[in-house]
C-alpha cells in the first residue's frame, strides 16, 4: 500500500529546466501547475484507507482494452465516504458497468471529478459535477481520463 508519493523535481522555473516533466512551473508573474500536478492532487485527496471489493464490466472484453482500464474502490476512514477511481488509457471512450457491494447508508448523488485529455495536452484541468449512483450503475469513461466518483456517507 502506498501512503505517500515523492515527485522530483517539484518546482521548476520556466526556461531553466533540465528535463520534463516537472510538477509545477513558475515564472516571475505566475505559477503553472501541470496536468501531472492535478492527477497527483486527485489521488492524494481521494486516497482512502480501506479497500472495497467491487467489479467493473466493460462493453469491450478484449484483453488489450482490459489492460488499459484501471479501477479502485476504497473507503475514507475519516469521513466514511466511498471513493471509486477509474482510469482509461485508451484513445476512445469506454462504457463500463460498476457494481458495488452495498451503498447502505450512502447518498445516491455523488461528486464526480474528471481529468481528461490527450497525452500531449498541457492545459487539462479537473472538472467536477454530480451524478446519480446505485449499487450497479453505468458510466462512460472518456478517452485518456482519470475519474474520481466520491459517494458521501449519509449524515444522520
Where on the chain are the PLM-derived regions?
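Aromatic/acidic polysaccharide-binding cleft in carbohydrate-active enzymes
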Residues: 1-71
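Composition- and surface-driven signal marking solvent-exposed, interaction-prone regions
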Residues: 19-26, 86-87, 95-101, 111-113
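Carbohydrate-binding surface patches
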Residues: 66-106
